[in-house]
Amino acid sequence: SVPTVNFDGEEANPDTIVGVVPDYLDANSKQTGEGRFINETDVRRSAQVIVIGFDIADAIFPFVDPIGKWVQFGGRRYEVIGVMEEQGATMFESTDAHVYLPITTFDQAFPWVEKEGNGVNIATVPKDPLLTAQIVEEGTNVLRLRRGVPFNKPNDFGIMTPDKLIGNFQAVTGG
């Protein structure tokens, strides 16, 4: 289960912890509403920083500017550097209750995540859409190596491309 975020007696329950790199915003068409997002320096240093979703900020900082404040999360302290722009609920989920950590910080703080069957997602957007197949192939090769998948065995992970996502959506909606 996801730990609570605590500040000065207030607490909020995030629904997802996201370990990210700076390109996450572009790859997922998201923006910060206040402060800044995680940068390369944060990732390199495994900085103890956190970006919180709009609902998390609203719950624990109702009358206080959250930027620069320190919160407790998962037994560690993190400086709030940003608040995500309010997204609201979509057909799939609401990201307003997500929290974001540098990927290196996430790996240190939550090493058990993948081992307990929780998903790890990697999102990327090619600069040239015609390169999607090449990027999928390269990503597949890297993941197989990192995960130790033998040559003669199937992938132990999935890759979702825009075409597959649209196909899944059409299968569910009958469109």
Place the predicted regions along the sequence by residue.
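A short, glycine/Asx- and small/polar-enriched loop/turn
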Residues: E10-N13, R44-R45
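Membrane-proximal extracellular/periplasmic loop immediately following the first transmembrane helix
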Residues: S1-V2, N118
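A short acidic, helix-capping loop that chelates divalent metal ions and anchors anionic groups
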Residues: P3-D8, G88-F92, G167-F169
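Membrane-helix entry/capping segments
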Residues: L130, L143-G175
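Mid-to-C-terminal secondary-structure elements
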Residues: V18, P22-D42, S46-N152
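Short active-site oxyanion
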Residues: N13-D15, F157
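Alpha-helix capping/helix-boundary segments
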Residues: V2, I56, K164-L165
